[in-house]
């Protein structure tokens, strides 16, 4: 589908058609739109946009998966027949992360990033509609009995790398990169991978200005050691997570330390793992070890990873062509010996020549060649200063460092945090053009204590509401009336179309680069002198403190709050 039409589902006009109406249309000065101010025509446009959101009743649905925060359905629009995926939030305390994820996905445009299609309303909550990916996730593919040659595996690794390279280029890193969050698409061209689930994504910290230390978030088996130790971390944490995914791809095993050997300091046990890789290309294994380096500074960037994988793919394809050329004369000779020129049919014809999926034990194998293609371990250069191999002479038992720490619960948890003010602001206050001011304290109640805290979820999605004492705890953080609190908690910025803007040097540094997808969708930058709608929250808080706030416009749907002047006066 054309990305410019992704918000046109279920009767939605394309975003380009709604742009002029949102920016003011015929009311006031069309060249200046201030943050926190909206003309009557703009307000009517917002009301119209909300009234035209699709309802869950507009779709037929089939559940295809579930996770810690949400359930995923394959849905078909009753009127248009369009097939999409619906991600329904199931955890009230994760609502802010879901809104942030929808905003971020709406700004991204890349073939290896899950495409955002629109929004669905159900029981007062917003849920994301995305493109439907037809072959599940990477973990499911690797756990299947399907034969995956090295060319396919390296191609999947390349797809994930270029998707993450694009994300990092935009100034954002994932923080929850796992094989579960890499979706697999299958078409006439074969397999391809798409990166999804950006609910924990964060702005890449700037070490030069001493950014706030980020919270511990993610899925423990894939989390970088520095994250697990609650140390400062950056986008190189994604590279370590990617390295664990490469281990899964190479050995076709789970990331669980019961299968994937780890060290006591949460690193990869290189020596033990290289006995599990079969005939893996040595340069592919070397890249995997580089990504899993305990020292973040020694890990490659995704741009470098992509270039390396391109070279590996090119070499593997050349070797495959050469092998086919050598097999052609042999096959031709066999056909000539068969009466009537019929092709020989044998068991060998049905078994792949080489299946790069050896296992420690035969019962884990998925084909005959898995059993008999084991090769002796090769020598790989390990440049990890923190690597502590197990002593094979003393038969040291396999290590599961995630069982040694009580807070990690054996790795069967997921850590999450409220969105920080440095990534994408979730507060959108529209001021009515009337007299009178309202203080910030009167309009907004705190979401959480000043210090940011990380939280963990139990391993079983079915156990969420019973085992999470903090579910719904945000509703009790304030003594205000529940209706008012719920409307103020999850106010969202930029439900209307996103636009580029002429940012100052400071705001340009804070804001995420999203010019390419917007230009692709037909948007143009604002005229000079206009204020951005999507600046960093820290900058917007300064603006709010410097100028008096007018009565907020109130319109509440799915936890999104806009408050009208008439309601305030009444």
Curated annotation (Swiss-Prot):
Entry's InterPro entries?
Actin_reg-Ser/Thr_kinase, Kinase-like_dom_sf, Prot_kinase_dom, Protein_kinase_ATP_BS, Ser-Thr/Tyr_kinase_cat_dom, Tyr_kinase_AS
Tissue specificity remark = Predominantly expressed in testis and prostate. Found predominantly in non-germinal Sertoli cells.
Q: What is its main location?
A: nucleus
The entry's ATP-binding residues are: 64-72, 87
Q: Name one GO molecular function term.
A: protein serine/threonine/tyrosine kinase activity
- Enzyme Commission number(s) from the entry: 2.7.12.1
* GO biological process per UniProt: actin cytoskeleton organization; apoptotic process; focal adhesion assembly; intracellular signal transduction; protein phosphorylation; spermatogenesis
Q: Which reaction does it catalyse?
A: L-seryl-[protein] + ATP = O-phospho-L-seryl-[protein] + ADP + H(+); L-threonyl-[protein] + ATP = O-phospho-L-threonyl-[protein] + ADP + H(+); L-tyrosyl-[protein] + ATP = O-phospho-L-tyrosyl-[protein] + ADP + H(+)
- Cofactor(s) of this protein: Mg(2+); Mn(2+)
Q: Which family does it belong to?
A: Belongs to the protein kinase superfamily. TKL Ser/Thr protein kinase family.
Q: In UniProt terms, what function does this protein have?
A: Dual specificity protein kinase activity catalyzing autophosphorylation and phosphorylation of exogenous substrates on both serine/threonine and tyrosine residues. Phosphorylates cofilin at 'Ser-3'. May play an important role in spermatogenesis.
What is the recorded name of this protein? Dual specificity testis-specific protein kinase 2
């Amino acid at each position: 589908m054309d990305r410019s039409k992704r918000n046109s589902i279920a009767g939605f006009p394309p975003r380009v058609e709604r742009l002029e109406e949102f920016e003011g249309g015929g009311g006031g000065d069309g060249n200046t739109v201030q943050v926190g101010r909206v003309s009557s025509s703009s307000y009517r446009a917002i009301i119209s946009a909300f009234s035209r959101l699709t309802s869950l009743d507009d779709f037929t649905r089939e559940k295809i998966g579930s996770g810690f925060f949400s359930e995923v359905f394959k849905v078909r629009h009753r009127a248009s027949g369009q097939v999409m995926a619906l991600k329904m939030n199931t955890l009230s305390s994760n609502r802010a992360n879901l809104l942030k994820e929808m905003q971020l996905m709406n700004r991204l445009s890349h073939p290896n990033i899950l495409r955002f299609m629109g929004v669905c309303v159900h029981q007062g909550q917003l849920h994301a509609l995305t493109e439907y990916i037809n072959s599940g996730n990477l973990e499911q593919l690797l756990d299947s009995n399907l034969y995956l040659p090295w060319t396919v595996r390296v191609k999947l690794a390349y797809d994930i790398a270029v998707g993450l390279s694009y994300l990092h280029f935009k100034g954002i890193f994932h923080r929850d990169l796992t094989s579960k969050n890499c979706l697999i698409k299958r078409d006439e061209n074969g397999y391809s991978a798409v990166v999804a689930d950006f609910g924990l994504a964060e702005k890449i910290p700037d070490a030069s200005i001493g950014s706030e230390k980020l919270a511990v978030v993610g899925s423990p088996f894939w989390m970088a050691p520095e994250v697990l130790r609650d140390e400062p971390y950056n986008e190189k944490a994604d590279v370590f997570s990617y390295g664990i995914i490469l281990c899964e791809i190479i050995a076709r095993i789970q990331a669980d330390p019961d299968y994937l050997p780890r060290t006591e300091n949460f690193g990869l046990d290189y020596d033990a793992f290289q006995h599990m890789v079969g005939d893996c290309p040595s340069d592919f294994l070397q890249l995997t070890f580089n990504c899993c380096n305990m020292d973040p500074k020694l890990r490659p960037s995704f741009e470098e990873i992509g270039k390396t994988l391109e070279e590996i793919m090119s070499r593997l394809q050349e070797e495959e062509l050469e092998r086919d050329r050598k097999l052609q004369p042999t096959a031709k000779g066999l056909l000539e010996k068969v009466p009537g020129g019929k092709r020989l049919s044998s068991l060998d014809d049905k078994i792949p020549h080489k299946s790069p999926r050896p296992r420690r034990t035969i019962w884990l194998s998925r084909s005959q060649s898995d059993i008999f293609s084991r090769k002796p371990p090769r020598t790989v250069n390990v440049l990890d200063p923190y690597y502590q191999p197990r002593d094979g002479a003393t038969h040291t038992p396999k290590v599961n460092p995630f069982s040694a720490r009580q807070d990690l619960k054996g790795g069967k948890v997921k850590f999450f945090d409220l969105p920080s003010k440095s990534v994408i602001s979730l507060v959108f206050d529209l001021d009515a053009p009337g007299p009178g001011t309202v203080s910030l304290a009167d309009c907004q109640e705190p979401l959480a204590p000043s210090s940011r805290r990380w939280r963990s979820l139990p391993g079983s999605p079915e156990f969420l509401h019973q085992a999470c004492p903090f579910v719904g705890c945000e509703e009790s953080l304030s003594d205000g009336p529940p209706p008012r609190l719920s409307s103020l908690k999850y106010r969202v910025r930029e439900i209307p179309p996103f636009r580029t803007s002429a940012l100052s040097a400071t705001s340009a540094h804070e804001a995420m680069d999203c010019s390419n997808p917007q230009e692709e969708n037909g948007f143009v930058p604002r005229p000079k002198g206009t204020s951005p709608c999507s600046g960093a929250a820290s900058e917007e808080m300064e603006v709010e403190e410097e100028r008096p706030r007018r009565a907020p416009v109130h319109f509440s749907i799915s936890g999104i709050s806009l408050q009208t002047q008439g309601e305030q006066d009444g």
